Amino acid sequence: MKNIFGKAILLATALLFSITGTSCSNDDNTTPEKEKTYDMSGFAKGADVSWLTEMEKDGVKFYNQNGKATECMKLLREEGTNSIRLRVWVNPEGGWCGKDDVIAKAWRAQQLGFRLMIDFHYSDTWADPGNQKVPAAWQGYTAEQMKQAVADHTKDVLTALKDRGVTNVKWVQVGNETRDGMLWNSDEAVTGQVSKNAANFAAYINAGYDAVKEVYPKAKVIVHVDKGQDLGGLTWLYDKLKDNGGKWDVIGLSLYPEDDNWQSYAESCLSNIQTLS
């Protein structure tokens, strides 16, 4: 297992300078204010802003500490964020988190210098440990067709991003919180649920992995699970994936501590990161 990721949530873009009318007359002794620069390298300090465009449509505004209305991504950059994560749904209601919406947000992020993580859910809505629903358009597929659908969807979205000029894609998640796999199906010959068909899960992961490398060869591919504090569950999942020829570059761990356990959860997660590496 080559790398580790503890729920890093990422963003990316190339800095955009805007020059407005500045006086250059001899009697103007004012010194133009320098554009602030931001270090967007190093340890990934990220945020998932997948809901941003929908929130903006609903009139939501964001304010800095001085009470000044500020565009959300600019505000995040000012506060030290250097990476953005954007989730992708296959055919979502209203188009939110669909391909076009993701491209729009990714382009905005790149213009601000953020690094990007693209998070494929392979579903029309949320994919999480209790819900890995097959997209409506993929219902009834065979395992081979499902594998091809994963590859095609992944390549389609990433190619569209690249064609738009988005170059700062540093990480790609193939699946979201896949503690027991993804693309669950009542047909055990097709399901990607690990507890029922680990070989299919590995095949679907590999289809996504290979598609990522076709478009962004240098991007790190993440297999993402929750319960970062649970070493037994983590080793079970990644061992199943490894035993079935699964490929990944980075282990992505989510952690959801509560008030009464945050310290032990954090310590366990850090220990698990070292163990899994």
Predicted regions and their residues:
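Bacterial N-terminal signal peptides that target proteins for export
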Residues: 1-10
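Bacterial Sec-dependent N-terminal signal peptides
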Residues: 15-38
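Core-facing hydrophobic residues within beta-strands of well-ordered domains
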Residues: 44, 168-169, 248
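Acidic-and-aromatic substrate-binding clefts and catalytic sites of carbohydrate-active enzymes
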Residues: 56, 60-67, 90-100, 179-183, ...
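Substrate-binding cleft and catalytic face of glycoside hydrolase catalytic domains
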Residues: 73-197, 201-228
